[in-house]
């Protein structure tokens, strides 16, 4: 039993720290989910980055705005296209996701992973909620 991945939050690190920690994580057999909140943090993406998550929750105010993923999506795809990846990173939209139509729209914008927590914490039956989401996609 152990971890498969680590979360590196760009807002808490310098680009060099992020790169060093990514290399160290890989040496330990871990994948890295790099979390960004704005286009100014796209410079934290390196060719070794496995996944890039766009957090839709403002870390200062804790307000969630799903539009953050859509605002960043095009610049994120451009930044990734400029890097010589062996395998391009998986794009993940994080927080504020609760409806199948939102997931469909995020998929159209290039996201393939979806981090959801609050939706399941607020329901009495997380299993049914997940089933409804899956069938709605």
PLM region spans:
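Short, well-ordered coil/turn segments that N-cap beta-strands
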Residues: 3-4, 28-30, 48-50, 87-89, ...
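C-terminal helical cap(s) of enzyme catalytic domains, especially alpha/beta-barrels
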Residues: 72-75, 107, 122-137
């Amino acid at each position: 039993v152990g971890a498969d991945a680590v979360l590196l939050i760009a807002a808490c690190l310098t680009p060099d720290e992020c790169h060093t920690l990514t290399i160290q994580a890989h040496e330990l057999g871990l994948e890295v989910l790099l979390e960004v909140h704005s286009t100014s943090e796209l410079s934290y993406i390196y060719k070794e980055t496995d996944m890039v998550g766009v957090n839709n929750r403002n870390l200062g105010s804790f307000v969630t705005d799903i539009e953050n993923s859509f605002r960043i999506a095009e610049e994120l795809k451009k930044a990734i296209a400029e890097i010589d990846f062996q395998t391009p990173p998986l794009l993940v939209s994080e927080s504020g996701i609760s409806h199948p139509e939102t997931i469909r729209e995020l998929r159209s914008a290039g996201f393939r992973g979806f981090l959801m927590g609050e939706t399941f914490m607020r329901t009495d039956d997380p299993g049914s909620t997940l089933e409804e989401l899956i069938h709605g996609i």
